[in-house]
Amino acid sequence: MIDRATLEQRVSAQFPTVRIGDESGDLCLTVERQQLPALAGWLRDEPDLAFTFLNQLCGVDYLGRDPRFEVVVHLTSFQNKMRVTLHIEVPEADPTIPTLARLFPTANFQERETYDMFGIIFTGHPGLERILMPEDWLGHPQRKDHPLGYEEVAFTHNEDWIYANKPFAKE
C-alpha cells in the first residue's frame, strides 16, 4: 500500500508536466489532454497503484475563461483506499479529448453524456452519439450560453390555458 506523498513523487517523476494539487483532501492532477490516456493507463496498470475504477467523468463549462471547458475524472484505487481527481482543460476552439472508454468501460456512457451535454468530442470513442437528448436536438444544453427555452407542462390546474395557447390547429 502506498501513501499520498509517494504517489505524488511517482507522478512527478513519470509525468513532469502534470500539475499536482489538493481537492477536498484528495490528490488532484491537472494534465494536458494529449497525456490523458498515458497517465490514466499508468495509474491503472502499475500494480502497486491500481487505480482500476473510474467512478465519474463529467464536463464543466467555465464561460468567460480560457480554456472554457474542463473534463473532470475521478479514479479510485480500492487496493490503496485512495482517490485521484484528474482535470483536463479543453479549449472551446477545439473541444476534443482522447477517450478513456478503452481503458475504463465505465467511461463509455459518461463520455457520451458529456458529449451530449457540453459538445466535448472524445476522439477514438467506440460509439460517440447522443445519449440523453434526441438526435435532432440542436446545441448542447449544459453549456452556459445555451438558450433557455422551455414548454410549460400541462397539469389539471393549467391545461385549459396551456392548450388554448399552443401553436397548433384549433377548432
Swiss-Prot record:
Its EC number is 7.1.1.-. InterPro entries: NADH_DH_suC, NADH_quin_OxRdtase_su_C/D-like, NADH_UbQ_OxRdtase_30kDa_su. It is a peripheral membrane protein. One of its GO terms (cellular component) is plasma membrane. Coiled coil: none annotated. GO terms for molecular function: NADH dehydrogenase (ubiquinone) activity; NADH:ubiquinone reductase (non-electrogenic) activity; quinone binding. It is found in: Cell membrane. Keywords: Cell membrane, Membrane, NAD, Quinone, Translocase, Transport, Ubiquinone. Belongs to the complex I 30 kDa subunit family. NDH-1 shuttles electrons from NADH, via FMN and iron-sulfur (Fe-S) centers, to quinones in the respiratory chain. The immediate electron acceptor for the enzyme in this species is believed to be ubiquinone. Couples the redox reaction to proton translocation (for every two electrons transferred, four hydrogen ions are translocated across the cytoplasmic membrane), and thus conserves the redox energy in a proton gradient. PANTHER family: NADH DEHYDROGENASE [UBIQUINONE] IRON-SULFUR PROTEIN 3, MITOCHONDRIAL, NADH DEHYDROGENASE UBIQUINONE IRON-SULFUR PROTEIN 3. This is NADH-quinone oxidoreductase subunit C. It comes from Herpetosiphon aurantiacus (strain ATCC 23779 / DSM 785 / 114-95). The gene is nuoC.
